Regions:
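Extended hydrophobic leader/signal-anchor segments used for secretion and membrane insertion
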Residues: 1-164
Length: 164
């Protein structure tokens, strides 16, 4: 017969080991993506001097009311960003000088070309309709992997200082 105390100690030991391994992997830059916003799998985050369109970045979303709403609804978890939100893994779709057009009911357009899977969902407040010229040190993050991705169609441009 296995004693309950032994089972408890074993469970605690295994849990501690799992948390330790997770912490080590995280400190080495490894991230497990389970969302549809990027290919599912194990990713490694590395610092870069420059960023370009197509690069995936780990980013803290801007401090906006839509971010807090998404946390309150359970769509975003709390985390280690300055706003107490988890970092997001997103592809850079737009850089300095690019023109972003957002129109309700239509996919986002970059320099006149529509991006697939970027029509905002009617149940979530989208970034205001308009045409935006991307500024220095500003990026827009749009995931074409999933129409349900939470990205710049909702929170707008992101300063590159938000990249982790």
């Amino acid at each position: 017969m296995i004693r309950p105390k032994l089972i408890g100690i074993t469970a605690l030991t295994l849990t501690s080991c799992l948390f330790s391994v997770t912490a080590v992997f995280h400190s080495l830059g490894f991230r497990l993506n389970t969302t549809a916003s990027a290919p599912v799998g194990l990713w490694r985050v590395q610092e870069a001097v420059t960023y370009q369109k197509g690069d995936f970045v780990e980013v803290c979303p801007p401090d906006l009311s839509i971010i807090r709403v998404m946390v309150d609804k359970g769509y975003l978890a709390t985390g280690n960003c300055p706003t107490n939100v988890i970092t997001l893994l997103k592809p850079i779709a737009v850089g300095k000088g690019d023109i972003v057009t957002i129109r309700k009911g239509l996919p986002v357009s970059i320099n006149g070309r529509f991006l697939p899977n970027t029509r905002s969902m009617p149940t979530i407040q989208a970034w205001p309709d308009g045409t935006y010229l991307t500024k220095e040190n500003e990026i827009w993050l749009f995931s074409t992997y999933s129409s349900g991705s939470f990205d710049s169609r909702y929170f707008g441009p992101v300063d590159i200082s938000n990249i982790r």
